[in-house]
């Protein structure tokens, strides 16, 4: 749920800075569970995501076939494991996929094409989101502006001396 909230706030930050959000690469988002979607709806974040999406899953009208081609937009997929697990939906052969999933084994999410090796890159949620908007990896200045006001982690290293 935290990553979905980060995404919603980043979209608001980018719009505030640039006036609009335009994707230069596809961003495929699959919420972990329906319960999380319900919570995001109650908290107002789902409306933010829908505002910027070009596709929102609809259980009353499920898509018939797995998607094999993607446009440069935000896809709000059915909760669960879609592209993240390399199930039926995969990127086109030879594409470069940047994802937050650790299950990026060679050929699982993207296969090689005759012209180019398919690449799977592991990254953080903010870097993935901003990269799809920019069409490239962000500079540090762009990253800092996009995550302004977002608590990315509550982790804090121990201040105790661990080794004497």
Predicted regions and their residues:
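Fe-S-dependent hydro-lyases/dehydratases of central metabolism
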Residues: 1-164
């Amino acid at each position: 749920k935290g990553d979905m909230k980060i995404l919603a706030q980043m979209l608001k930050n980018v719009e505030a800075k640039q006036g609009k959000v335009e994707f230069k690469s596809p961003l495929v988002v699959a919420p972990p569970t329906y319960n999380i979607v319900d919570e995001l709806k109650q908290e107002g974040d789902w409306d933010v995501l829908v505002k910027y999406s070009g596709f929102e899953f609809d259980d009353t009208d499920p898509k018939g076939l797995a998607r094999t081609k993607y446009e440069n937009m935000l896809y709000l997929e059915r909760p669960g494991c879609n592209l993240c697990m390399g199930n039926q939906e995969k990127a086109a052969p030879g594409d470069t996929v940047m994802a937050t999933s650790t299950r990026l084994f060679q050929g699982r999410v993207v296969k090689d094409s005759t012209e180019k090796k398919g690449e799977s890159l592991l990254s953080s949620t903010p870097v993935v989101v901003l990269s799809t908007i920019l069409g490239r990896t962000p500079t540090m200045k762009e990253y800092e502006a996009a995550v302004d006001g977002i608590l990315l982690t509550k982790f804090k290293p121990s201040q105790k001396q661990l080794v004497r």
